[in-house]
Amino acid sequence: IKEKFTKALVTKVEKLKVGNGLDDVNVGPLIREDAIDKIDKQLKNATDKGAKVLTGGERLTGSDYDKGNFYKPTVLDNVTREMDIFYEETFGPVIPLIVFENEDEAIEMANDSEFGLASYFYTKDLARVEKVGAALEYGMVGANEIAISNPETPFGGVKHSGFGRENGHYGMEEYIQVKFINLKYRD
């Protein structure tokens, strides 16, 4: 299914509108200049080791983009564990395509990270949602959904992506100091 998926993905990514986040766009600017440098470094490392940029892969320039840190949405094929992008957080519009043979391998690859904020997967099988969701070592898991954060639900990660939670009643517990008083009462 990889070829069919990749072709459809590249077509969709090439239609994304990039621009000022306050305008009607799909992709806004990166937070800082060094975020662009990080993406460039990751892409160079990956392509030097055999990955292929299918679309994007460069900073956007020109009158609409000179006042911000805009990067062309990118699809990177043939990504392997030998590449920095497999392990490092990118925080930019890059989709690395990583092939796996079965569900167990996909879970193992996803968990092979020092980070654990959020993970996402798609399925039509409710039993798979329960199994994969429980097996993923992440603080938040989106099944068939990417918008998984809202004020009513706990937000936070595991591993090097944090400890504790924000939002929801679990988030409120982070601000509560529990005090225990032990009293031995005698008449």
Language model features with spans:
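Conserved C-terminal structural/oligomerization subdomain of aldehyde/semialdehyde dehydrogenase
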Residues: 14-17, 66-187
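ALDH superfamily catalytic-core signature
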Residues: 1-80, 109, 143, 187
